[in-house]
Amino acid sequence: MSTMPPASSGWIRKMQLGQQYMKTWPIEKQLAPMFPENRIIKATRFGIRFMPPLAIFTLTWQIALGGQLGPAVATALFACSLPMQGLWWLGKRASTPLPATLLKWFHEIRDKFAEAGIAMAPVRQTPTYQSLAELLKLAFKQLDRSFLDDI
């Protein structure tokens, strides 16, 4: 287990944590009913890919047609802010400590690693959603799917 994200509350740091969390979280169908991350990550990736071109198109269209620039700029800024909102949410989620029910499940999965003879680094601090994402990613690679039965 790598880390607990620093408690830095900076906006840029939250966005960076969001990117890291987005790369770490396993996109698995079995997790979708319990965690909103799958939907948020898909929407954020879509926004990162398509919103900047949409913003440029909006500005270009308004300038070409001689329309007002103010609403076009507002629309472009809104379109560009959507993926940033997703990254911020993911960053905030990554640094949130796990609630008691997920904390219990987190330790049960770690115990299954121990039963399988796979060494895990000790947990040093209160586990966060980032810690859970790292553990789940490893579990989907190295364990059978029975660890999902306890959810």
Curated annotation (Swiss-Prot):
Predominant cellular place of this UniProt entry's protein: membrane
Localization: Cell inner membrane
Keywords: Cell inner membrane, Cell membrane, Membrane, Transmembrane, Transmembrane helix
Pfam families in the cross-refs: DUF412 (PF04217)
Transmembrane segments: 46-65, 69-91
A single cellular component GO annotation: plasma membrane
Membrane topology field: Multi-pass membrane protein
Domain of life: Bacteria
Family membership: Belongs to the UPF0208 family.
Protein name as it appears in the record: UPF0208 membrane protein YfbV
Gene name of the encoded protein: yfbV
